[in-house]
Regions:
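Arg/Lys-rich, low-complexity, intrinsically disordered basic segments
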Residues: 1-62
């Protein structure tokens, strides 16, 4: 599955907001699949984009 597909799936299931979806689509081109997946998992649990990004960078890197 691609990064964009993962992001769209989370949005379609209403796990992330429209704003988070749009931001993640732009963000995906700069980061690895593992980074994006970690961010999506954290945002599904209620973390903000910025907090999820910091956690993903610390956890899996860029």
């Amino acid at each position: 599955m691609t990064k964009e597909t993962e992001i769209k799936k989370c949005y379609d299931m209403r796990k992330i907001t429209k704003r988070q979806h749009d931001t993640m689509m732009r963000h995906a081109s700069h980061h690895s699949f593992a980074h994006i997946r970690k961010m999506l998992d954290d945002m599904e649990k209620g973390m903000t984009f910025s907090a999820a990004h910091k956690a993903a960078t610390a956890s899996v890197g860029k």
